[in-house]
Amino acid sequence: MSGNFRFMMDQKDIVRFLTTTIDSFIQDRLINKEQRTQHKDQCAERLAAEDGNTDKETEVEYSDQAVLANLDWGIEALEEAINTYNMETKLARLDYAEKMLQVCAMLNPKQKTAGVPNSYLSAWAHLNLSYLWKLRNNIKSCIYHSLEMFIVDPFFSRIDFAPELWKNLFLPHMSSIVGWYSEERHKLMMEVLPESTDFSYTADFDKVFNESLVFSMRPNQLEKLQKLEQLYGESLDENTRLYAKYYNDCMNPDSTSSKKVVPMLPIAEPPMTPLHELSRSVPDFVKFGPILPKSSGFSMTTRRSNDGLNETTRENIASNSNHSKGEQSSLWAAKESIIEEIEDDLDSEHYDASVDSDKINIFSPEPKKNIKDEDVEPKVYRSNQKNQMNSPNISPMESPRRASNYSSTNPLRRKKESKFLRLLSNRFTGSIVSDHSLSSSPDTSSDHIFTGDEEVMVRNNIKRKNDSQTPSMNQDNENSLVLNDSSHCESEDGYQSSSSFPKLEKLTIGSKPPKDFVCPITGQIFSDPVTLETGQTYERKAIQEWLGTGNTTCPITRQALSANILPKTNYVLKRLIVSWKEQNPELAQEFSNSNTPRGSSCSPSAKDITMVSSIQRTTDSPSQKYKDDYIRQRNNRFTRVSVGASPTSVLSQAAVETIINSLTPYITSLCTSENLQDCEQAVLEIARLWKDSKTDPQIHSYLSKPTVVSGLVEILSASLNREVLRRSIYILSELIFSDERVGETLNSVDSDFDCLAMLLKNGLAEAALLIYQLRPVFAQLSEHELIPSLIQVIQNKSEDIDDFQLAIDPKAAAIAILEQILIGGDEYNRSVNASSVISANGIPAIVKYLDKTEGRRPVISILLCCMQAEKSCKSSIANRIELSPVLELFHAGNDSVRGICVEFLSELVRLNRRTSSNQTLQIIKDEGAFSTMHTFLVYLQMAPMEHQIAVASLLLQLDLLAEPRKMSIYREEAVETLIEALWQKDFSNNQMKALDALLFLIGHVTSSGKSYTEAGLLKIAGFDQPYNVLMKAEQLGHSDNDFMETMEDEKNAMKSWQKRVASVLCNHENGSIFQALEECLKSNSLKMAKSCLVLATWLTHMLFTLPDTGVRDVARKSLLEALMNVLQSSKNLEEKILASLALKSFISDPTVHEVLRVYAKSIYRILRKLKKYSTVAADILKALLNLNSVDVTELWSCKEVVELDLSSNGEVLSLHYLNGQVLSGHADGTIKVWDARKRIPRVIQETREHKKAVTSLCSSVDKLYSSSLDKTIRVWTIKPDGIKCIDVYDVKEAVYELAANAKLACYVTQGTGVKVFNWLDAPKFINFNKYVKCLAVSGDKLYCGCSGYSIQEVDLSKYTSTSFFTGTRKLLGKQTIHSLQIHDDLLFACGSSIDATAGKIFSLSSKMVVGSLSTGLDVHRVAINSDFIFAGTKFGTIEVWLKDKFTRVASIKMAGGNTKITSLASDADGMMLFVGSSDGKIQVWALD
């Protein structure tokens, strides 16, 4: 058939066509927000209509409500995703929308939910899912859901959801069906027309759809036409579904088959094959088939009754008559033409339900048949003018109507009312006026859609008018004018024909303001519109007068008003009015300053009302009664009369003129006088007169002239009289509230704002109100530095200004301006401005303002800004604030307000004292009329993503106030939200917020509001520096006198709180938080990874203080690998220490030993370097080296760094390491000081104060002691740049060995025994008949290594000696202990090798041998660090043993061959080894 040729393409072309078409359609919908909103409203209208058709007593199940709620939430979330520019928020809202929409998309289409067909809900969901996948750039899924929409419900997809898409995808395939329908309709029309009429199929084909012919049909013909339309619609739906499935198959070929099979193209077959090709003259609306009006709900069948069938069908078909022949409007334009349906303006009580039916039913060919109420459609459209003129019983200006003999407001009848399918032509509304009238106002085609009650009214009106005009069409002109006036005032649009109203011919549709801009009471354009709870909008002054007379109902709807205070001005409507006035200045002036009020264009004058009354007195016919009722109804809604006539009227014109005449001389004086006093007096008088008449538009217009405004501004800049300044601001403020153009006038001159800013700085509080009304931008406000002045306004008491009440309290205006300043600008500006508020002592006054109901939100916002910028002010706010207003604001506010409240409370509880935080939390928990925890829980489940973290954190803290012994839904939901946020890799901001919330939850908060959890953990690990720096800064920042007194309570409270937090977080869902932290540690964000590491370290540290519930295994499996990775790869010292602290917690677990073995080689060197900063690193290293499964020899590694040739100074007799420096003593008496902080030592000092060889070096605290063969002992001070000799002691004998401290010196001379010198008295000799080779001091004990392989212990307090150890004497050779070292309460004694043992290790406490060093070489020198024992031999080798296990690890061979090792020293960290030899060289080894 025609049109199918364009789809004769292969599968790739079809896919390309579908992609292009559907993608373009969805893209257009996403771009056009107004269209989406309009479409949602239309669908909601259908749902509402269906709700009105169902039995009200039927209770809707909760599950059904949930389904509808999911659909609504899904659409709202999708709309938020479309509107936001934040990619993280967009993705989150899309995920949420998908979950909600999938619920409806998967419904069974054959069932119903809450009376609504599931197919409709599912199709609607699929449409929104196609939007969703387009936003995700997944075109394939987008196409899938678009096609599923047509498969699930082709009918409503065609008429409601996507008519444009249906036209492009499916309509070209339906040409045969449309051709069949056209032929069948042609046959029916041929039966109606007279035989003489030329009405062939090929000539004037569009006349087939001229529905005026339907009025001539007989009942059986109407029934045939109805069945034809029903069959036509079913055919379109069936084939639409068929082609949608075909398209779906093309997009998704069978993947299971190895051979691709092209789907078979379906054929749209009509019930009968048409005889002709489809004529181009068939209107587009016919091709779309029957539609269902949205006001009809989902009723898809027609009530077939013998009484009402013909009239119902006639009305169903008659709606097409007003579609003109040449009209080629697009489908969407047609759809938009019926978006708005005007409400029924008339109460049913004004209608006569007993009107004679055979007088009303003037169109029925059988006048005896009545039209039942069930057959009355919600909309009836007029036939065109030509057909009306051909009817002998119809006036040229009237459209045919039919009435009901039952009241349309009867609830029983409404409940039984049937809805009918009608063609798309019903979307196009015609006019009841002539072609001339239509051409004069082409934009009003959508202004004449009636509700059912209005139709009945108009039909009755027309019938009665015809009855009164039956004798003659030439009745009295005046009476005819009145009747025409009343009969043509349709609904609220007040439409009229220019030929029918000669007296009001100027007030046509094109020359009057939109009805929504006109007050129904005053008849004038709104200047201060207020919208009541009933949805009706009135002028503020008018409705105030109405309520002031004792009325408590809405003037139009008669609904009771619950609020006693009028709402705020409807600024949205006001802005629209201002915009319209700018485009229509002359018309706006006419309707604003008209001498005669205009309620609408069809409102009768007083003369008309008089004439109607006279007619009513002479005629009692139903027609006249109806006219009287109708005119009264229109008068009540649209007209106003003089002041004395109605309590809803405003000032009479005479009173207005009197006030204007009174104002004129003062205005003249203000604008022209050069005398300041005269101008000031004029301002006072103008204010007095304006106060009583400010709502009258004419007076307002008179005072809004630019010259008057300029005069008032000049007074502000020139006058010094505060009363005059206040009155000037009062007048300008009221003018701006009524007309924003006055504010625009002031904003156009920068000096005007500067003047107001200066007045505010000079202490005029009212200036804040005017500045607020001018809506300045942040740059203007920041330029003038208004914060101190605004704080002053807030702090000062309100001054009494007599009875001149300002619209807004200056304090409220000041707070609003202050909020704008604080939230404006960049982060630096916000911080500086918030600090200015705090320094101006503004917080106490701002907190007090919370007592007022209005203005709480900006107060909370200001306080939140202050706390975020200056954390230290939290305590001040917490001590002053009452939290009840904050919670009340949370309960009553929207999502934005609730978000501010939650953020405020979350910041407020982050105090530096746990006890104070708990007290604040307890107040939050107990305050409020409702359960705070329950309210937070409900809000948590529906809060936007950006607020969920704060709510969850606050809710969890409230729950933790009590010991978490039982299951708590609050706790579970809060922790679940926080952990879920940690999993959201696509939303790094949300992850960071969750981590911050969890870290602050621990409770380590400084007085400045910073978390010091990391510093506290580093301190536990032995790295105190960050903690000490932080605490030092905090102490400088504040003084807390009673801190020490409450330290114990604070410590206990913190311990209890942290234990609760750790228990709740670790045990939630068997440690799921550790799995989430594992993912966070993989983040590319350094800040996030650091925060996650801190939290993981704290949790693992606390985990082993809690009872083991199996969570430890989960933590180990989740974090161990990640912690090892941090330890190996991180370049940050703090991170390595934190990872070490977390790893230490797992060391006791045997399963961790295997992991340590695997990583031993890679972490060994790291731990060795780290142990100088952290004690936990040393603990881990010790555990690693002591593992039986670890081969220490594989870990050992050393490298010679440098060899220093000092042979010119002779032998290197002693080496000593002290605070990053190495000191060497040489045979020529030289002492050299080396900087050993780098791998290659550097000489920083060389001194030769000893005359002979320096035999020994030792230190104590900051003193160095040296002994020499020159018979002296020298004492040196140690400085970073070298040493300085401060004392010299001549001991009269050569000193071979020295051990000294601040109290005494023990030294060895040439003879036996040892000498002890207390630096004051003569040396004491302790003789034990042995030659001493080495010394070691521990406390008040001196240990002497002697010949004969023995050790003597000397009590320095008593100067007595005892034998500590006596070795086995050998007959051959000398056995001597050459070196003693004390380390970690162990005494290491090394010397001659006896039985392959050259050293023994003793416990000083038990004096027992705890180990031995196995080697066949004699050991002359020993050096010990935390990990290893180094033993130097006389043959140039150094034996290395593991310190804790005494296991030989390696042997280091000196480069000089068999040179004797004379001295050894190791640095404190065990990373470097310094070796002195007899050939005068020092070798430096790096111990990796």
UniProtKB/Swiss-Prot annotation:
Expressed in roots and nodules. SUPFAM superfamilies: ARM repeat (SSF48371), RING/U-box (SSF57850), WD40 repeat-like (SSF50978). Residues 512-587 form the U-box domain. Induction: By rhizobial infection. Promoter activity is detected at 3 days post-inoculation (dpi) in dividing cortical cells in roots and at 6 dpi in young emerging nodules. At 21 dpi strong promoter activity is detected in mature nodules in the nodule apices including the infection zone, with lower activity detected in the nitrogen-fixing zone. InterPro entries: ARM-like (IPR011989), ARM-type_fold (IPR016024), ARM_LIN (IPR055566), ARM_LIN_2nd (IPR056514), E3_ubiquitin-ligase_LIN (IPR052858), LIN_N (IPR056512), RING-Ubox_PUB (IPR045210), Ubox_domain (IPR003613). The keyword Hydrolase does not apply. Its EC number is 2.3.2.27. One of its GO terms (biological process) is nodulation. Pathway: Protein modification; protein ubiquitination. It catalyses: S-ubiquitinyl-[E2 ubiquitin-conjugating enzyme]-L-cysteine + [acceptor protein]-L-lysine = [E2 ubiquitin-conjugating enzyme]-L-cysteine + N(6)-ubiquitinyl-[acceptor protein]-L-lysine. Keywords: Nodulation, Repeat, Transferase, WD repeat. WD repeats lie at residues 1207-1244, 1249-1290, 1412-1451, 1456-1488. Putative E3 ubiquitin ligase involved in the rhizobial infection process. Plays an important role in the early steps of bacterial symbiont thread formation in roots, and in growth, differentiation and maintenance of nodules. This is Putative E3 ubiquitin-protein ligase LIN.
